[in-house]
């Protein structure tokens, strides 16, 4: 099962987080601090979207750099690093797709978070991989995202 997806800037500040397991805010914060401490020295080696792996607290975490952002995908023991890397590919492609006009920067990503969430919800459902084809993800997401909101008399 996929436990979480975290996206940080290059300073380690959380820009986006999505947890698929039920842990409280205190444990989330503790996990995020530990993750930063365990991986910060390796960030320089993750350039060009090279996937790196770390394991602590019984979780396997695959992380990589995309543009100005660091992405961390954490899974339980039943998922190995290869399975997590496979889940990473549609996430990275989706991130690049929504940021293609201005590039993958922190500011551009923040502006595009609503669309990214739609993409992510198509890729991962309740902690399990659902869609991997970018075309399918775009099609499902565009159906949800591009429909205008109509104001009717209530």
Curated annotation (Swiss-Prot):
Keyword Cytoplasm: yes
Xref: InterPro entries: AP_mu_sigma_su, Coatomer_zeta, Longin-like_dom_sf
Highest rank taxon of the organism: Eukaryota
Keyword annotations from UniProtKB, A to Z: Cell membrane, Cytoplasm, Membrane
Any one annotated GO CC term: COPI vesicle coat
BP-aspect Gene Ontology terms: intra-Golgi vesicle-mediated transport; intracellular protein transport; membrane reorganization involved in phagocytosis, engulfment; retrograde vesicle-mediated transport, Golgi to endoplasmic reticulum
Record note on disruption phenotype: Knockout cells grow at least as fast as a control axenic strain and differentiation also appears normal with fruiting bodies forming under appropriate stimuli. Uptake of FITC-dextran, an assay for fluid phase endocytosis, is unimpaired while uptake of FM1-43, a membrane marker, is slower than in the control.
Subcellular location, record wording: Cell membrane; Cytoplasm
Transmembrane regions: none
Membrane association type: Peripheral membrane protein
Principal subcellular localisation of the protein: membrane
SUPFAM superfamilies: SNARE-like (SSF64356)
Family: Belongs to the adaptor complexes small subunit family.
Self-association state and partner proteins as the record states: Component of the TSET complex, a heterohexamer composed of tstA, tstB, tstC, tstD, tstE and tstF, which may act in plasma membrane turnover. tstA, tstB, tstC and tstD are likely to be the core complex members with tstE and tstF acting as associated scaffold proteins.
Protein name: TSET complex member tstD
């Amino acid at each position: 099962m996929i436990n979480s997806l975290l996206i940080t800037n290059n300073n380690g500040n959380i820009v986006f987080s999505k947890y698929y397991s039920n842990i409280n805010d205190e444990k989330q914060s503790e996990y995020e601090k530990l993750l930063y401490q365990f991986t910060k020295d390796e960030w320089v080696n993750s350039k060009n979207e090279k996937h790196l792996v770390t394991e602590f607290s019984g979780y396997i975490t695959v992380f990589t750099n995309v543009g100005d952002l660091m992405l961390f995908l954490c899974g339980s023991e039943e998922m190995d690093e290869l399975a997590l890397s496979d889940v990473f590919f549609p996430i990275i492609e989706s991130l690049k797709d929504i940021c293609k006009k201005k590039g993958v920067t922190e500011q551009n990503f923040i502006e595009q978070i609503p669309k990214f969430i739609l993409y992510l919800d198509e890729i991962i459902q309740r902690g399990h991989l659902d869609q991997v084809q970018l075309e399918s993800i775009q099609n499902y997401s565009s159906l949800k995202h591009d429909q205008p909101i109509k104001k009717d008399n209530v």
